[in-house]
Amino acid sequence: MFHVKHFDVLVIGGGHAGTEAAHAAARMGSQTGLITMSRSGIGVMSCNPAIGGLGKGHLVREIDALDGVMGRVADQAGIQFRLLNRRKGPAVQGPRAQSDRAIYHNRMLEATDQQQNLDIIVGEAVDFVMDGERVIGVVLQDDAEILAKTVILTTGTFLRGVIHIGDVSRSGGRMGDKASVRLADRIDSFGLPMGRLKTGTPPRLSSKSINWDVLEEQPGDDEPTLFSFLSKGVSARQVSCGITHTNVRTHDIIRDNITRSAMYGGHIDGVGPRYCPSIEDKIIRFADKESHQIFLEPEGLNTDAVYPNGISTSLPQDVQSEYVHSIVGLEKAIILQPGYAIEYDYVDPRALDSSLSVLSVPGLYLAGQINGTTGYEEAAAQGLVAGLNASLEARGSDPITFSRSDSYIGVMIDDLTTRGVMEPYRMFTSRAEFRLSLRADNADQRLTPIGLALGCVSDERKQAFEVKIEALDRARRLLTESSYTPKQAGEAGISVSHDGSRRTAMQLLAFPNTSFKDLSLLDPVFDGIDVETQQQMEREALYATYIERQQKDVDLLKKDEGHKIPADFDYDQLSGLSNELKSKLNSTRPTSLAQVGRIDGMTPAALTLILAKLRQSSKKRSA
């Protein structure tokens, strides 16, 4: 046994959570080690070759606002960009990019190699070095010990992972990679609440064997919406996707073989993602539907592989071949890799606090699918939070907590740590109460100041952000200081009530179908505002009234978040609480009254009782 360099932060796993965690800690100035089984596994897209989407695109923008790497790499690897929900309001529109798998991996590996304070360590983590109950390092398979002040575990689907194809099951973290079993056994010894989840992936098809001529083409947007606030344009050649559909014949084949599916054949105990069901689930759960849409997504510019989004499966290979060939355009499709389901261990995230630190195991943080989430973006956002907080702990500083009122990151962390998960968790805009102000377009305005205060933001981003804020402030002043009569507005084609009241340009901008083009008829000075700033101001004007009303709820939330709960607060002493609530509170250990209020089963009476006890305790301490 021998000892290696002592790190401030060690990260286990080089997936989306691990890379983001390692970069975040390194940007904070912590000496960081990233342990991965292989350099070729860093930044790998294990499932679909895409980043972003509804809710998920917001997370990527927020990661980028804090100078994370996912957004920039996704822009460099993007081969098709689309803004989803374009017909709806800006608050719920989500940027999405089809990615070239190889470019994404290569750019993420390059960024990781070039990141200061970050070392890549190739090896398998099999155990922790302990000092009493505290984690102080990691043991590798070759018995090498690497010591650290804090450790972040990001095992993805590798923790006791099992791959299922029909009735054939084998240990694996993903196709071609072995599972992490010894580490799983070690985690068992911590006594954490754990469970099993599953996810799945579709068969990969050969592009050359697909009849693209009979398929509907889905091109990207003419004006791509990028993820990073620093990106200037697309880097890779853009391509189209194809669209086809399952049919009655497809469904008959699947129904006739449903018991041969690993899921329906009783081989899988883990719960799968509700919003990304297998094709078997779709046929059974939506039996009245005769067709399901399939997006044929190229996996890159220099590969023959195509990802058929919509037909993930755990059926045997012969059945996969039969149902694929029943689909229009895929009659002669060659399957390059069979679809499969993967089952893995996860930790109930209620065992963590809002910093993603394990409550009962000091020095250990968890991020990604080990916390019960699904998706690259959710994993990366957790990695960012864990990386920042592990670095802060390593230097002896207080943790950073993201609020439900300031970010989707805050919404997700709060959902996980106060409510837990019964199925793989994914982000949606509907999960955010304050989504009108948590838009993808203003992620930098919400979070970059936090990043600057923490010290995790580069000088390049700081300068770009300051230039943008100055432009927004100038435009905002111009819009709020300029006012016009109803007659003037009418002459510019803006229909307002003739009530004699003057209205600011910002107020006029909030009227339906009013744009800067109309305002320029009132004063040519508005033409001098750049297009990006104009779009930002139009969104602000559109939501101004609603956000003003929403602010009251935000203030109430912040007030409740201000009621901090001591770590040693004794819920058992409160005779008015039910045993069920006492149990939930003792296991979750909420840190604020706001978190208490979001625990399942919490009543107004119980909340009042806890608040009264907090005030009583506060008076005693100050007396």
From Swiss-Prot:
Annotated GO biological process: tRNA methylation; tRNA wobble uridine modification
Domain of life: Bacteria
SUPFAM superfamilies: FAD/NAD(P)-binding domain
Cofactor(s) needed for function: FAD
Keyword Protein biosynthesis: no
Pfam families given in the database record: GIDA, GIDA_C_1st, SAM_GIDA_C
Flavoprotein among keywords: yes
Keywords on record: Cytoplasm, FAD, Flavoprotein, NAD, tRNA processing
Main location: cytoplasm
InterPro entries: FAD/NAD-bd_sf, GIDA_C_N, MnmG, MnmG-rel, MnmG-rel_CS, MnmG_C, MnmG_C_subdom, MnmG_C_subdom_sf
Compartments reported by the entry: Cytoplasm
Binding-site positions, NAD(+): 272-286
HAMAP family attached to this UniProt entry: MnmG_GidA
Function according to Swiss-Prot or TrEMBL: NAD-binding protein involved in the addition of a carboxymethylaminomethyl (cmnm) group at the wobble position (U34) of certain tRNAs, forming tRNA-cmnm(5)s(2)U34.
Subunit structure: Homodimer. Heterotetramer of two MnmE and two MnmG subunits.
PANTHER family: GLUCOSE INHIBITED DIVISION PROTEIN A, PROTEIN MTO1 HOMOLOG, MITOCHONDRIAL
Name of protein: tRNA uridine 5-carboxymethylaminomethyl modification enzyme MnmG
Organism whose genome encodes this protein: Roseobacter denitrificans (strain ATCC 33942 / OCh 114) (Erythrobacter sp. (strain OCh 114))
